Amino acid sequence: MKYFMGFDTSCYTTSIAVLDETGCLVADKRKILSVKSGARGMAQSEMVFQHTRNLPDLLDQIIADLGTPIELKAIGVSAFPRSQPDSYMPAFLVGEGYARGLAVMNGIGIWRLSHQESHIYAGIWSAGGPNKDRFLAVHASGGTTEVVLVEKNDDVSHITLLGGSKDLNAGQFVDRVGVALHLPFPAGRHLEALALHHHANAIDIPFSVKGLQASFSGPASHVFRMLAKGYAPESVAAGVELCIARSLAKLIIAAIEKTGVTDILLVGGVMSNRYIRETIQKKVSKASFMTKLHFPDSKYSPDNAVGAAYFALQRGT
């Protein structure tokens, strides 16, 4: 049996994953970076430091879980944020360095891909599709909120940006509200827990989507005013989820109308939120009954290395 390893060292998570040659996940280790209480992020230098410290521990855990030596066939690594010539982020160099070292030592191939492509591959691996040559992908996270057109032959070959947020990303919106509510950072799962069972009392947050451009800075300012007036945190959290779901659903509908493509893959940390997923599904399905939305398991929506490993499997066999 041959194995394929993936690395992803993103803004807030160190990840390593291993797939066997059948595509079965045999190891998946992640460690969320530690952000100081009350902070709204961290410097790239701190990310690099924490990734450098985390990777040896995760590799030790991978080896311990596997139990016996394995034959690596290829390695995939997220080496830059997007598939653009000027796309660069120091944090990704940590994972790329480890991946290149392992590849050289084992005499195997290494496949570089963007962090966004890794999300797309993880989504396809988990959701079992889309299985079309052209599909839409929604990538909603703390670092990105984009709707893209993916056109492929045997693999993801070309990604065209259609639209997205022009200011704050959806995940940034969540995190900034989370910090204001004194939730741990990143705030996604904590805000989701706070909002649970409170959507009937969600505050109405005006959302702004014009064509394929959304804005979350205005909604964020509205939320801060509501908090200053003493609105219940639970109702605020529920309102944030609803605002994001409405905005993303409207972006998706606009992308469908522009391209005629009705298969949509939804990835990124924001897509791990159950209420947001369900609300998008309802609103998009109501607007266009021909659409097919593909959601990966919520475990594979946030940052992970499974997509990079799956990319290596696709390229290295």
Range-by-range predicted roles:
Residues 10-49, 156-161, 295:
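Short glycine-rich, Thr/Ser-proximal phosphate-binding strand/loop in the N-terminal lobe
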Residues 58-73, 251-262:
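Phosphate/pyrophosphate-binding loops at sites that engage ATP/ADP/AMP, CoA/4′-phosphopantetheine
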Residues 193-264, 270-285, 313-316:
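A contiguous, well-structured pocket-lining segment that forms one wall/lid of small-molecule binding clefts
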Residues 69-80, 260-271, 294:
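Short glycine-rich phosphate-binding loop at a beta-alpha junction
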Residues 1-2, 108-136, 310-311:
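Conserved phosphate-binding catalytic cores of ATP/NTP-utilizing and phosphoryl-transfer enzymes
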Residues 264, 281-308:
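Conserved phosphate-binding/catalytic loops in two-lobed NTP-binding clefts
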Residues 63-99:
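Short beta-strand-loop/turn "lid" adjacent to the catalytic site in phosphate-handling enzymes
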Residues 2, 6-10, 26-28, 131-133, ...:
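A short helix-loop
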